[in-house]
């Protein structure tokens, strides 16, 4: 790779690090080509991307970015998974690592926050941005009658109790 290609790669990676919400770093030693293709396709389906780059070039590209805290993780055969959705890359990486022990999650970063492997796993357990939006829309679209029922339920129960006492007193 000549100097201009390296400079282009550093510039591209710098843009990637600045544009994405989360970056996950993992060791991939021992993964077969088929496994790597499977990981890439799963990432693509989730809206995330996997990139293998020279550690030295990735380290240079990290300078001046919010995710610069992952620099110490760039040792050995590392891959970078990133996505604009704060959960997508972490979720796919953790799920893939569960089924394939050759992918070892080293950590990552979400914005300026550095994540250890447990932090990446915790991030992966959160619902995605789309799932949260769907829940919010569902709550907003709940019919007003349900809200009225919830508000009126205590009064209705109280009225039934008073009615039962009244019938009991009449019978006595």
From Swiss-Prot:
Role of this protein: Forms part of the ribosomal stalk, playing a central role in the interaction of the ribosome with GTP-bound translation factors.
Source organism: Methylorubrum extorquens (strain PA1)
Subunit note: Part of the ribosomal stalk of the 50S ribosomal subunit. The N-terminus interacts with L11 and the large rRNA to form the base of the stalk. The C-terminus forms an elongated spine to which L12 dimers bind in a sequential fashion forming a multimeric L10(L12)X complex.
Entry keywords, A to Z: Ribonucleoprotein, Ribosomal protein, RNA-binding, rRNA-binding
Protein family (similarity comment): Belongs to the universal ribosomal protein uL10 family.
Cellular component terms (Gene Ontology): large ribosomal subunit
One Gene Ontology molecular-function label: structural constituent of ribosome
NCBIfam families per the UniProt record, alphabetical: PRK00099.1-1
Pfam families hit by this protein: Ribosomal_L10
BP terms from Gene Ontology: translation
Domain of life: Bacteria
Protein name stated in the entry: Large ribosomal subunit protein uL10
InterPro entries on file: Ribosomal_uL10, Ribosomal_uL10-like_sf, Ribosomal_uL10_bac, Ribosomal_uL10_bac_type, Ribosomal_uL10_CS_bac
